[in-house]
UniProtKB/Swiss-Prot annotation:
Protein species of origin: Streptococcus pneumoniae serotype 2 (strain D39 / NCTC 7466)
Family annotation (CDD domains): TrmD-like
Alphabetical GO biological process terms: tRNA N1-guanine methylation
Classification of source organism: Bacteria, Bacillati, Bacillota, Bacilli, Lactobacillales
Keyword annotations from UniProtKB, A to Z: Cytoplasm, Methyltransferase, S-adenosyl-L-methionine, Transferase, tRNA processing
Binding site for S-adenosyl-L-methionine: 108, 127-132
Catalytic activity field: guanosine(37) in tRNA + S-adenosyl-L-methionine = N(1)-methylguanosine(37) in tRNA + S-adenosyl-L-homocysteine + H(+)
Protein name, entry field: tRNA (guanine-N(1)-)-methyltransferase
UniProt function note: Specifically methylates guanosine-37 in various tRNAs.
Keyword DNA repair: no
Family that this chain belongs to: Belongs to the RNA methyltransferase TrmD family.
Amino acid sequence: MKIDILTLFPEMFSPLEHSIVGKAREKGLLDIQYHNFRENAEKARHVDDEPYGGGQGMLLRVQPIFDSFDAIEKKNPRVILLDPAGKQFDQAYAEDLAQEEELIFICGHYEGYDERIKTLVTDEISLGDYVLTGGELAAMTMIDATVRLIPEVIGKESSHQDDSFSSGLLEYPQYTRPYDYRGMVVPDVLMSGHHEKIRQWRLYESLKKTYERRPDLLEHYQLTVEEEKMLAEIKENKE
């Protein structure tokens, strides 16, 4: 996968040199390039200006971003604008992006964008209902969530298939050594070696956590007969 990032602050992306994303780059599975669009600004390197019609704050000018975009070697990229007014990012969207060969992220700053910048864009995306000072942190979050889904980046595909949201439910509790720590012990079922009972326990705990913490996820989740019975028991025990 090739990722190009248009930003005023390329130095903010140093975390992408480490951990899973960094290893993907070392393996040649991922190429990330940064483009400081200030370097393409014609007007005394000014990238922002006052909005026509008046108003608070400054807007990013169209020319520096267009020229930076035009300079990128690309074929048919998905172009993502980080915008608080965009569609909210989620796991399904990360899985969709992981199928792409080329991504371009445009990171904003200041009050907003000249609207004409959006003619370059295929997707306008937000992390949530809050405002950041720029799009860099949002871009890094999206890149991390996407890159880990690329085949061969994480050793076992099941490692991310069991993650919260990948299945539509929150992830079940997990434990490792020691068995007993300060009186807190690992559930006996996980020590039993009985694979079917472990599967059932994990599914039950996953449903329970989702019901308690993110019941909204269940509104769009297609329950199996087994899951319906488990959820009914969970609700009954809560009453």
